[in-house]
Structures are given as structure tokens and as C-alpha cells.
Amino acid sequence: MASLKSLFLLFLFFFTAQSRLTTNFYSKTCPRFLDIIRDTITNKQITNPTTAAAVIRLFFHDCFPNGCDASVLISSTAFNTAERDSSINLSLPGDGFDVIVRAKTALELACPNTVSCSDIISVATRDLLITVGGPYYDVFLGRRDSRTSKSSLLTDLLPLPSTPISKIIQQFESKGFTVQEMVALSGAHSIGFSHCKEFVGRVGRNNTGYNPRFAVALKKACANYPKDPTISVFNDIMTPNKFDNMYYQNLKKGLGLLESDHGLYSDPRTRYFVDLYAKNQDLFFKDFAKAMQKLSLFGIQTGRRGEIRRRCDAIN
């Protein structure tokens, strides 16, 4: 009964959060808001094609633990270790932070003290997703930025590449997300890359789910990893720069990269949805868009809560 009550309260939160936000929030205060973000992310994506994956990951690491409040952007100080310096966030690509800073700088010149960093992340994520072939979804605007960011508050809140699928399901359910929504959001691994340290320990072990030829290729790709920890492999080796449903097709063939990827196809609670999305890209796009929109509304601050940061990396 308690879990049902919690889910009801989460549903009520999402409904009321959406009702407080609007898609045209900046139409009068910053009419070029969308154009400025689109120009910024397009230029960045052209010069560095990994930007889309970097920002999508940044968005998840900001929103999932405690809500979409741009707390992951805040830099640490001598008195506080911020979220971005927690161990799980140290591998977040710099291009993700850079494009948000560029967008914020341009927006501050056009509309000072008006646009929140959390709104910038949400829109930039959606727009970058589109540049790599992903689906469109409406982004509701009016979020405010958090005044706090503490590494200690992230403990056990974000899934690791090695987290068992049962625990990942629990983590998502505790935030009000269903198993199907979790599987859909995992499709973000359709683009981007992972460092060898996140999976190389499992390669070559028995019963890990790797296609044998794929395991050999991964061993070869990561052979110099001890000397160069920056070596990485694409999450989707078939269409690494295109957002599509190939990720799910790969899982069925033993071509998943991370332990969490393999878990999606080994657990009967999630395998059904993997099969579904592997067969139907339109359905995957529809469900992914809905889940991303829902995630973008999670834990937001509005009204008098939070602030509009002048710089995304520092509290006013």
C-alpha cells in the first residue's frame, strides 16, 4: 500500500510540475531563446560529433538523482565538494559542460538574468537528440536552478555500468519510473562511448553475455588500457553516431557493452521490451520521447524556489 501511495504522489508531482511550466515561458522575456540554443548546439555538434551523447548523459546525471536543477554544473569550492566532482561524475565529458556554458553566455548577452541553466540543459538535450536522428518532444520551461550541490547527496542514486539490473529497476521505480520507461531511457546508449575501465574486467569471463567475436575485439581494443585509461569503445558499434533502435538489436546478439546493457536482455522483466524496441523503432522513439519529457520534469524547482544563476557553474 505504501508503494502505491508513493507512486500516486509521484504521479501527482509530475502532473502539477507540468501544469506550472509552459512551452513558451520565454516568449516575451527572451524571444530568441530557442534560436540561440539551437545555433549554439548546432555549431558545437558540427565541430565535435560526440556532443549530443555528452549532453544527454549530463542531463540524466543532473535530473535522475534529485531533480532537474542544474546542480551537476556547479563547481566545487574549498568548502564544498560539488556533484560534478563525485566519483560517478568524473567521467562526464567536458563537451557537455562546454556547450551549456556557451549557450548560457550567449543568452546572458541577449537576455540577462532571465534563462535558467536547468532550462538550457533540457532544451539543449532535446535539440541535440534531434541532430543525431532522435525524436522531437515538447520541453516545458520555467525551471529554476538549485542553490546547492553536494557530492555526498549522490550516494547510490545513479546506476553504475556494473549495477545489477534488479537494483537498476529498484532505482528507477523509487523515482516513479516503470520498467518499460527504464528500458526506453536505456536507449540513450544508442550513441556515445564508454571507457574500457567500465567493462574490460568482464570481457573474457564465462557467462557474461558477450558474443565471442565481440569479446575478442574488445580485448584487442582495450589492450593498452592500463597505460592509457582514456581508451574507449562506442556503446553501439553498428551505428555509433546515429540515434536509432540498433542498440536493442545489438543486445539480442551479445553486442552490448556494459554489464547493465547485458542485464536488460538477461532479465525477463526487461527482455520483453528489448525485443519490442528491437523490432519497432517508431515505438521506441515514442516511448523514449515520453520518458525523456517525464524525466525533464522530475524534482524541478519553480516559483520562488531556487534561482536564475548568472553563471551555470556557480551559485549567485
From Swiss-Prot:
Glycans are attached at residue 206. Binds 1 heme b (iron(II)-protoporphyrin IX) group per subunit. GO terms for biological process: hydrogen peroxide catabolic process; response to oxidative stress. It catalyses: 2 a phenolic donor + H2O2 = 2 a phenolic radical donor + 2 H2O. Its EC number is 1.11.1.7. InterPro entries: Haem_peroxidase, Haem_peroxidase_sf, Peroxidase_pln, Peroxidases_AS, Peroxidases_heam-ligand_BS, Secretory_peroxidase. Keywords: Calcium, Disulfide bond, Glycoprotein, Heme, Hydrogen peroxide, Iron, Metal-binding, Oxidoreductase, Peroxidase, Secreted, Signal. The active site is at residue 61. GO terms for molecular function: heme binding; lactoperoxidase activity; metal ion binding. This is Peroxidase 31. It comes from Arabidopsis thaliana (Mouse-ear cress). The lineage of its organism: Eukaryota, Viridiplantae, Streptophyta, Embryophyta, Tracheophyta.
